[in-house]
C-alpha cells in the first residue's frame, strides 16, 4: 500500500471525518494518514483501542513515536495518559493495549538508525520555549539531530519558515491554511521550503508540530 507518499507535495488529511478501518487486532481500528507498506509499514496513523483490546508483542525495526490523544495507553513499561509523548527507538518492542480504551497519533518506521534514545514525556512535559508572536505556549518534546517536536498554542495568525519540511496535527481548535480549514485531528504535511501561513480562528488552536 502507498498512501500520501509523495513527500514533495503539500498534503492535508481531515482525519476527524474519516471512517475507522479495522486492524488485524480485534478492537483496534485506525485512520491512515501516510503509509508505505502493508502491516510492516512506514506509517503515520490515528489508532483507536477499544476497552480491553491489545496487540500481541511485536518489535518496531524503524522505531515508533506516539502521542496519546484520548484515554490511557498501556504496555509493559507503564500507563500513558492523555497528553503523553513517547519515542521508542528502532528494534524496541512491546505488547500495546488499553484496559479502558484510548486513541493515539502514531508514527512507525521513521527513526534514523542512530536515534537510540527512548523518551516518555508526561502530559505538560517538555521544555518551555520563549513566546513568539501569536504563540501563547510552546513546549519542546524532542530536539534531535534531524528533527524537533513541539506542542504549541496559537491565538492569532502564524507564519513559520519551513526549510526542512514540516508536519502537524491539530489537537484542538482550528485554523485556515492554503484555503483548507484544519480542525481537530486534521493532519498537514508541507514539503521543505514551503512556509506555513495559518489564519487562526477566535478560539485559537493547539497543534503538535514536527
Regions found by a protein language model. Name each.
Residues 50-51, 60-75, 156-158, 162-178, ...:
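Glycine- and acidic-residue-biased ligand/ion/polar-headgroup-sensing regions
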Residues 45-46, 56-60, 77-78, 96-97, ...:
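Short histidine-centered beta-strand/loop micro-motifs
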Residues 28, 79, 90-115, 181, ...:
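Ligand-binding loop in jelly-roll beta-barrel domains
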Amino acid at each position: 500500500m502507498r498512501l500520501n507518499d509523495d513527500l514533495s507535495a503539500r498534503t492535508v488529511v481531515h482525519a476527524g471525518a474519516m471512517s475507522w478501518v479495522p486492524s488485524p487486532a480485534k478492537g483496534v481500528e485506525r485512520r491512515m494518514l501516510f503509509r508505505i507498506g502493508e502491516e510492516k509499514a512506514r506509517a503515520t496513523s490515528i489508532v483507536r483501542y477499544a476497552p480491553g483490546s491489545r496487540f500481541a508483542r511485536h518489535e518496531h525495526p524503524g522505531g515508533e513515536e506516539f502521542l496519546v490523544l484520548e484515554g490511557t495507553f498501556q504496555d509493559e513499561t507503564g500507563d500513558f495518559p492523555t497528553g503523553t509523548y513517547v519515542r521508542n527507538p528502532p528494534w524496541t518492542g512491546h505488547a500495546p493495549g488499553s484496559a479502558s480504551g484510548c486513541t493515539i497519533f502514531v508514527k512507525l518506521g521513521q527513526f534514523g538508525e542512530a536515534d537510540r534514545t527512548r523518551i516518555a514525556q508526561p502530559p505538560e512535559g517538555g521544555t518551555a520555549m520563549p513566546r513568539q508572536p501569536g504563540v501563547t505556549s510552546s513546549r519542546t518534546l524532542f530536539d534531535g539531530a534531524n528533527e524537533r517536536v513541539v506542542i504549541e498554542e496559537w491565538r492569532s495568525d502564524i507564519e513559520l519558515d519551513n526549510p526542512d519540511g514540516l508536519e502537524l496535527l491539530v489537537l484542538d481548535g482550528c485554523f485556515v491554511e492554503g484555503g483548507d480549514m484544519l480542525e481537530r485531528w486534521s493532519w498537514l504535511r508541507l514539503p521543505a521550503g514551503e512556509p506555513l501561513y495559518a489564519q487562526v480562528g477566535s478560539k485559537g488552536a493547539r497543534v503538535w508540530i514536527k
